[in-house]
Amino acid sequence: MNNGKFGVLLVNLGTPDKPTTAAIRRYLAEFLSDKRVIDLSRFIWKPILYGFVLPFRSSRVAKLYQKIWTDEGSPLLVYGRRQQKLLAERLAGIPVELGMNYGSPSLEQAIDNLLKQNVEQLIVLPLYPQYSGSSSAAVFDGVSLVLQKYRTIPGMHFIRSYADHPAYISALKETIEQSFDKHGQPDRLLLSYHGIPQRFVDTGDIYAEQCKLTTRLLKQAINYPTEQVMMAYQSRFGREQWLTPYVDQTMKTLPNQGIKHIQVLCPGFSSDCLETLEEIKQLNKEMFLNAGGEKFEYIPALNDNASHILLLEELVNGFVRNRDE
């Protein structure tokens, strides 16, 4: 039943349409033009972006995407479509659309599809468990911008984060236990979160606090020594200080400390993508083994796991139930 005419908008970061230099350039131009992502003065940043970053970075990033591209397309989009389909089946009668903050399918296209179905209450669910101004707030900005073109807008419920949701912690615990059962318990379990500039945290972003909260709850949930669970941050961009410790530096130092077997989980990524499949599963694995490590296993993202879809359903129904009461 959908008496309240609810509609769900799942949002993820985005992906290029193809693993080509031209497609990557278009995608990066949109992504890196967002002031939530790069907050430098446009007068300073645009010449850097178009004069240096896009000409030199696009071809290199295209080669990285080619390593992880599947017959169905970009893993992020493939899993996003599966999440959309499976969640719609669970919600039975409530339409679900997938939109990307950058690239396709666009937020505009997704919202338009929902409003054509007479949705009166829009539930926006960014697929970022931990809030950050550079990700979650960018979704809010994007949705608000799209709604400006409509005379009548729907009511909106924005799910800001779910870093401590019991179903989220339970789903992560399940994936960790499956990996331990398959590969044995490692010397260290490393939780790798996407990094952001330290300056963002210093000026009020709660992202680091939310990552630490998820880590603390996971430590309590799993049957594994808490002192053997580590945190680190990946994917830094540019020269300024980002959240530490950095994943790549951690990979190079652990073997010297006698740590020969590690497993890595990226709790902040709801779907596997370039940052998990290439950066962690391939590049950082190589760093660890080259530094003297012996065993490295990457624990997949929640993707289209049943426990992940159940989590998304609970997040949506939490709002629907409150509206119906």
Curated annotation (Swiss-Prot):
Subcellular location: Cytoplasm
Positions of Fe cation binding: 194, 275
Organism, scientific name: Photorhabdus laumondii subsp. laumondii (strain DSM 15139 / CIP 105565 / TT01) (Photorhabdus luminescens subsp. laumondii)
Name of the protein this chain belongs to: Ferrochelatase
Presence of the UniProt keyword Transmembrane in the record: no
Gene: hemH
This protein's record includes keyword Transmembrane: no
Highest taxon, organism lineage: Bacteria
EC category: lyase
